[in-house]
Regions:
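N-terminal phosphate/diphosphate-binding loop that engages ATP/GTP or pyrophosphate donors
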Residues: 228-250
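Generic helix-packing signal
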Residues: 17, 227-228
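Post-Walker A alpha-helix
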Residues: 223-224
Length: 250
């Protein structure tokens, strides 16, 4: 097999994905090994090429938050808050998966991770195919994650159909994996996005309801305010959520 390197024209890479092949794609974190995430046979190839254990699930790359309901049974407001703040970017949000997601992606579980990568070429590829990508890091299981197309080729030249050369990855570290499938939320994998940043965004998204005036006086009114305008509460809430996330982090 010849591994084709794509630079500016990604139409060939889009055809490979549509036809069930594998293409390594650039992101802001590390290169990913992408396949059509709705094609079970294509996803199986990822496991085979990487030597990835079958019990480890895969996340899906998506073009943005607008498609979250397409692949997840329920998307809580907090997940929408985080996707609005950090997508495209290095945050993978784990939610309950819809039955349309192939079992091989879920590795026997009932949740799926979604992430929108911050790289123009991969976003263009997602748009060109109209498909979600199952895309773990483009390295053999246990090896260092690649930060360039050359590093991908050193691993998989002749073993995958294509690689998109998007230059050197800016972050060079995997995305943070956050489970929001149930409460309390849990950090499943520490990554490029810190717990403090996640907590700060969650607090920003809160609406606090308080009461002004003594109870029963006839002067009681409802007060609603975003946490960002309530500095003392904001600081305490951010610290509390940060500590909770750190306590769950793997």
């Amino acid at each position: 097999m010849k591994t084709e390197v794509f630079t500016d024209n990604i139409s060939g890479a889009a055809e490979i994905i549509k036809n069930g092949g594998l293409v390594a794609v650039p992101t802001e974190t590390v290169y990913g090994l992408a396949a059509n995430g709705l094609d079970a046979e294509a996803v199986e190839k990822i496991y085979e090429v990487k030597g990835r254990p079958g019990y480890k699930p895969l996340s899906l790359m998506v073009p943005g938050a607008a498609v979250m309901e397409r692949y997840c049974l329920s998307v809580p407001p907090q997940a929408k808050t985080l996707s609005a703040r950090f997508w495209p970017g290095p945050l993978t949000i784990v939610l309950k998966a819809r039955p349309e997601i192939p079992p091989v992606v879920l590795a026997g579980g009932d949740t799926v991770g979604l992430r929108c990568p911050d790289h123009p070429k991969t976003l263009a590829l997602l748009a060109a195919t109209g498909l979600p990508f199952a895309a773990p890091s483009a390295n053999p299981s246990g090896e260092k994650s690649p930060k360039s197309a050359d590093e991908v080729l050193a691993y998989f030249d002749g073993k995958i159909e294509g690689v998109i050369d998007g230059g050197l990855c800016g972050i060079g570290r995997e995305s943070t994996l956050l489970s929001m499938a149930e409460t309390p939320y849990r950090i499943l994998r520490r990554g490029a996005l810190g717990e403090e940043e996640i907590a700060d965004a969650l607090v920003d998204g809160m609406t606090i309801i308080g009461l002004t005036g003594p109870s029963g006086s006839g002067k009681t009114t409802a007060l609603r305010a975003r946490c960002r305008s309530l500095a003392p509460f904001r600081s305490t809430a951010t610290r509390s959520i940060t500590n909770c996330l750190k306590a769950t982090a793997s």
